[in-house]
Structures are given as C-alpha cells and as structure tokens.
UniProtKB/Swiss-Prot annotation:
Gene: hutI
Protein name per Swiss-Prot or TrEMBL: Imidazolonepropionase
Keywords associated with the record: Cytoplasm, Histidine metabolism, Hydrolase, Iron, Metal-binding, Zinc
Phylogenetic placement of the source organism: Bacteria, Pseudomonadati, Pseudomonadota, Betaproteobacteria, Burkholderiales
Residues holding N-formimidoyl-L-glutamate: 140, 315, 317
Biological or metabolic pathway of the protein: Amino-acid degradation; L-histidine degradation into L-glutamate; N-formimidoyl-L-glutamate from L-histidine: step 3/3
Function: Catalyzes the hydrolytic cleavage of the carbon-nitrogen bond in imidazolone-5-propanoate to yield N-formimidoyl-L-glutamate. It is the third step in the universal histidine degradation pathway.
Keyword Ligase appears in the UniProt entry: no
Length: 407
C-alpha cells in the first residue's frame, strides 16, 4: 500500500471523548503503521504531499476491541431460550440434556470447517461495527481434540478476516460429563495434558478459568494459574459473577490481565485488582440476558481507579450478542457508566485487558493504523443509538476493509 494522509476528520485518538481534535489528520506509512496524528494545520512538511483520503468531517476513533468472547462453538440454544420463557427452569433444561452440555456435545460433533463457518457468521457483524481486535476463548470442547479444534478455528479467523485475534484457553470452563464427580482429576487433565499440548502448538495467548460455585474452586483455579505461569502465559478469570468468593483477589495475586463479570466483587477484590493492574471487564449482555439484579460495584471501581472494559461475552447460553455498540449502550443504561467510560471500555481499556495496549485501543505513531470512521455528530451517539448502523468505514493496517456504501 502507499503512504496516505487521512484528513478532514474529527479525531478521538485515545478512546477518550474528552480528548479530541476537531480538525485533524492521520499520516499512515506504507507499512500500515501510523506516522503522525494531530491538527490538520500542523501536518509536518514531509507528509503534506502524500496521497490524501478525505473523510468529510467524520469522527474517527481507534478500532474497537472486543476483549471477552466465546465466538467458536457448535450450534446454538434458541430453543432453550424459548423453554425458559415458557417457565422451564435452567436445572430442568440441564436434566433434559440441555445447557452447556448440549453446546459441548454440538462442538465435539462439529468439524473444523463447520465451526469456522458458524463462527465467521458471528464475527461479521462485529467487524461491520468497527471491531479490529477480538479475544476468542475455547471451553466448549473440554477435551484435547475439541479444544484444539476450537483454537485452530480462532487462529484461522484471524488469518482470513481483517481482525487481530487473541486466543484464550478456557479448558477450566465447566466439568465435562465424563468427569462428573471428579473435578480434581479433570483439572489434572487441563494442567498436565491439555494446556502443555496446546501451548506447544502455539495456539494459546492466555489462560482463563471459570471460578464459581458451579465452576471451579479457588484451589483448582490456582492450579490452572500455576500451570499457565510455568508456560509463561498470562491469565484471566471469570470471577464473582454469581457469588462472591475471592476469585478476583486470586486473579490479582497472579497479576491477571483481567477479571471478568464481577457482579459480586467486594472492596478487597477491587483493591487487589488496582494494586496488580488487573482490568475489570464488565459484561452487561450476560447481566441482561440472565436477568441478573446485582450490579458490579461501579463506584468502588471508580474510587480505586481500576480500569473498566466492556465486552460482548458472546456465547450461546447467556449472551448471544454480536454488537459492541449495544454493549456500550447496556453498560451506560444498566451499569450507569458514562459515555467516556464506555468508549474507553471498548478501546484503550479493552486492549489492556488483552495485554495488547501497545498495539490496539489508541492511535499513536508507530502503532497499527486500525481505526473506525463514524456517521455521528457526537461520540455520545455511539452509546446512544442501538440497532442503527453508525460505522461508515473500518481501516485495518491503513487499508479500508469495510465501507458501508461499498457493500
């Protein structure tokens, strides 16, 4: 590609709507990195005569980052949704062979090609909303071959779509049926066989665990973290979603990239996260879908200065959500986040939750030229509208990879 000067734009370079430039320009090198950003009147002489792209006064933000998803899995669970609406309990659905076990079964039965096809359909609407980086977890295979297949598909999505994919091994997501009553033995399998094999194949960027009464205990979670540490892999945790239990504090002790959900997080956990630099990833889609009533402790997170990120938590059981903009709206409406917090939560703070703050979430010299162009008069509209297509163009590595008027 050729070096380009993008001009006639309003710039929110670092995901903060309180830090913008009204008449800005972005100089992008031929290798897809940013050479310079700033006021149009201050363009350095070396870039003035570069070929130009006129954005007609549109807002530009960093490409959005969806930092918590379960995008790869077999099938879907709309039938269970209908059953729950008819009054059937989750426990009864599980007794009938539904719930997470049904997704595990569908994922194990699906070919790699089928998993890719289904995940690609879920990914496309996110890309059309300006997402340029995404995390994808395993965790619906719960045995080596299927977990490998999920992570391979996640890697393939990053190779075949214009998006940076970060993979997370979530073998400790649930207890597979064949290990019923033998949770410690399954954790042995995760730590001693699955994680080493998948890490050796280069399929794992981070390791996650579901620490909860219906998931894995603190002791079991710590074993997974120790196994990750032996491999030099960063960790993250599903913590305090359904009950308090010290999961976030444990995650902080291992300097986790993030602790996610956090509805039942207490002040000790918040303080530990602040001390360790662990990002709080809030998932309002799941909160909404399961009709949760206990909100994450937003005021405590603010008071302690813990960075807040937002993510779709796309998954078939509790958050079949493929819109990061709707996630922003939910974060503001349900959790009372400000527009500033919501936009930072899907840019700079979301990138930090992936350990990728030096690559994504901000537009600065030397970084990838990944940005979204918006049809909006103000940045508040990104969190205000839902169901309205606002993203006009997506640029990845300096190249336009999506344009609404070109579809």
């Amino acid at each position: 590609m050729k070096s380009t000067l993008w001009h006639n734009l309003k710039l929110c370079a670092h995901g903060d709507p309180n830090d913008t430039i009204a008449d800005a320009a972005i100089a992008v090198n031929g290798d897809g990195t940013i050479a310079w950003t700033g006021r149009a009147s201050d363009v350095p002489a070396g870039y003035v005569h570069w070929p130009r792209e006129d954005l007609r006064g549109a807002w530009v933000t960093p490409g959005l980052v969806d930092c918590h998803t379960h995008l790869v899995y077999g099938g879907q669970r709309a039938d269970e949704f209908a059953q729950r609406l008819a009054g059937v309990s989750y426990e009864e659905i599980a007794r009938r062979g539904g719930g997470i076990v049904s997704t595990v079964r569908a994922t194990r039965d699906a070919s790699e090609a089928t998993l890719f096809e289904q995940a690609a359909a879920r990914l496309r609407p996110l890309l059309a909303e300006g997402v340029t980086a995404i995390e994808i977890k395993s965790g619906y295979g719960l045995e080596l071959a299927s977990e490998r297949r999920m992570l391979r598909v996640a890697r393939q999505l990053g190779e075949r779509f214009p998006v940076s994919v970060y993979t997370t091994f979530l073998g400790a997501h649930a207890l597979p049926p064949e290990y019923a009553g033998r949770a410690d033995e399954y954790v042995d399998e995760v730590c001693e066989r699955m994680l080493p094999a998948l890490a050796d194949e280069g399929l794992v960027d981070a390791v996650d665990v579901f620490c909860e009464r219906i998931g894995f205990t603190l002791a079991q979670s710590e074993r997974v973290f120790e196994a990750a540490a032996r491999r030099g892999l960063p960790v993250k945790m599903h913590a305090e979603q359904l009950s308090g239990g010290g999961g976030a504090a444990l995650a902080a002790r291992y300097r986790a990239l993030s602790a996610d959900h956090l509805e039942y997080l207490d002040e000790a956990g918040v303080a530990a996260m602040r001390a360790s630099g662990t990002t709080a990833v809030l998932l309002p889609g799941a909160y909404y879908f399961i009709r949760e009533t206990k909100q994450p402790p937003i005021d405590l997170l603010r008071r302690h200065g813990v960075p807040i990120a937002l993510a779709t938590d796309h998954n078939p059981g509790t958050s079949p959500l493929t819109s990061l903009l709707l996630t922003m709206n939910m974060g503001c409406t349900l959790f009372k986040l400000t527009v500033q917090e919501a936009l930072l939560g899907v840019t700079r703070h979301a990138a930090a939750a992936l350990g990728a703050g030096d690559r994504h979430g901000s537009l600065a010299p030397g970084r990838q030229a990944d940005f979204a162009v918006w049809s909006a008069a103000t940045l508040a509209e990104l969190a205000y509208w839902f169901g309205r297509p606002l993203c006009e163009r997506v640029v990845k590595g300096g190249v336009t990879v999506f344009a609404r008027d070109a579809r």
